[in-house]
C-alpha cells in the first residue's frame, strides 16, 4: 500500500471514528468472506463493518482523539462503526459470535470510554431504546390512571354516602312504625 493510500485510509477511518456513536472491535480470524458479508448484512443500517491493518487503525484512533484501545488492535481486527443504536449493533455481533465461534469480541468504545468485552455483552443484552421508552410510557400511563382513580375516589365515595343517606331518609325504618 502506497504512503498516499495509507494516509487516505487513516483519514477515512478517523472520520468513521468521529462520526460513530460507538465502535465495536472484533477479531475475525477463521471467518470466510461469505461469513463477513453475512455479518455486514445483519448489522442492517445501524453500523458499518470494516477490516483494516492494525497500524492504520491505531493512527486513525489517535487522530480521532480515541485512547485506550491500542491493546485491542492485535491480530486480524475488524471494527463495527455504529452510527445508529449501539444496542442493535452489539446484539447483532453477539448473536453472530454465538453462531460463529471464530468471531471474537475484543471490546469497544462509547461515550469517550473504552469498553471491555463484558460491557459490550451487557450492552447487547439491553433492550432497544424504543422498547425501553415504550415500557416507560406504559409505566407512566398505569401510574397516571391510578392517580386519577385516587383523585376521583373521595368524590365518588361522598356521592355514594349522600345517596345512601337520602335513601335512608326516604325509607321509613322499623322504629317509625310504632
Curated annotation (Swiss-Prot):
One of its GO terms (biological process) is translation. InterPro entries: Ribosomal_uL10 (IPR001790), Ribosomal_uL10-like_sf (IPR043141), Ribosomal_uL10_bac (IPR022973), Ribosomal_uL10_bac_type (IPR047865), Ribosomal_uL10_CS_bac (IPR002363). GO terms for molecular function: large ribosomal subunit rRNA binding; structural constituent of ribosome. The keyword rRNA-binding applies. CDD domains: Ribosomal_L10 (cd05797). Coiled coil: none annotated. One of its GO terms (cellular component) is plasma membrane. SUPFAM superfamilies: Ribosomal protein L10-like. PROSITE patterns: RIBOSOMAL_L10. Keywords: Ribonucleoprotein, Ribosomal protein, RNA-binding, rRNA-binding. NCBIfam families: PRK00099.1-1. Part of the ribosomal stalk of the 50S ribosomal subunit. The N-terminus interacts with L11 and the large rRNA to form the base of the stalk. The C-terminus forms an elongated spine to which L12 dimers bind in a sequential fashion forming a multimeric L10(L12)X complex. HAMAP family: Ribosomal_uL10. Forms part of the ribosomal stalk, playing a central role in the interaction of the ribosome with GTP-bound translation factors. Belongs to the universal ribosomal protein uL10 family. This is Large ribosomal subunit protein uL10. It comes from Mycobacterium tuberculosis (strain ATCC 25618 / H37Rv). The gene is rplJ.
